Every structure is written in structure tokens, then in C-alpha cells.
């Protein structure tokens, strides 16, 4: 079988209110560019836990600060880094109702879309997610990850979001 990691139940060492989210969340998001394990896992899982442990009012004002780090990860054109950045974008959009509005207002869609356009036909398998508790995560094709994230962005962004996506990724079909 595949090597596995022993997992503990995630919990903060103290109350979540004592954690400096504005300081640490951008650091963890910036770490999604890293492709070596276990640093990659720590960056991705740390980002997810911070986002899930805090509320709407704490995370939404930080989204404009996260966009440059996500864009830097996407601009590496390194499939694992691109997959990690898209996974974080998907998490933000699914966890918080107003995240898409913040992304549209801070021009996040426009800044995040050029790389998915260039890699939309990339069939490289990348390791994503650590829910399976297998070292490195489960494998998924990058083009599938890109399509799922763009579909979520189109669904949450409405007509304006779909129009922006179609302007940067002309081959995108949300019904596919």
C-alpha cells in the first residue's frame, strides 16, 4: 500500500480569536507555490484550516491580500502549484457566500484567469487534497481541476463572472 501519515484531529493550540489571521493566512497561501512535501501539505492544509476556523467577517477583508499570492502560484505554470492555488480559490468560493463579490470588486477574477487559460488543456496528473491521508494526496488531472474551478467561479459569479471568464478563457464551456 501507499505510505500513510498519522493524523491527529485538527485543533488550534488556543482560542481561534488569539490567532493573527491577517498575518498568517497570506503566508500560508504564499506557501502553496512550494512543490516539495511536507512543506506543500503544511501550506495547503494550514490555509484550509485557517479559512475553515474563522468566520466571514475575518476572511473576506483578507481576500484582496491573498490574490497576489494566488496569482504568483498560478504564474509559475507549475501544475502542482496551479492546482494548489485553484483549490484555495474553490475553498474560498464554497466557504463564504460573499467571496465572489470581493474577488470581482478587487479585480481578482481578471488577475487569476490568464494561467488557467494557458493550462486548460494540460492533462498532467497532480496530487491534490490530503483527505485520503495518503502522502502527497490523491491524483487528479490539471485540466479537470481547472474546469471545476472555472465552473464554480462562473456559477458563483453569475453573468458578470461568466463574461469575465469567457473573455480570458474563450474555450470554457460551463455545461461541459
Question: Can you say where each PLM-predicted feature lies in the sequence?
Answer:
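N-terminal "cap/leader" segments of large eukaryotic alpha-helical scaffolds
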Residues: 1-42, 166-176
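Alpha-solenoid helical repeat architecture
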Residues: 32-35, 74-77, 120, 135
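Short, flexible/disordered secondary-structure transition segments
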Residues: 39, 57-58, 81, 99-103, ...
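Core helices of alpha-solenoid repeat scaffolds
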Residues: 17-28, 56-70, 101-117, 162-166
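Hydrophobic residues within the alpha-helices of tandem HEAT/HEAT-like
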Residues: 28, 46-54, 66-74, 81-99, ...
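Acidic, Ser/Thr- and Gly/Pro-rich intrinsically disordered linkers and low-complexity segments
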Residues: 120-142
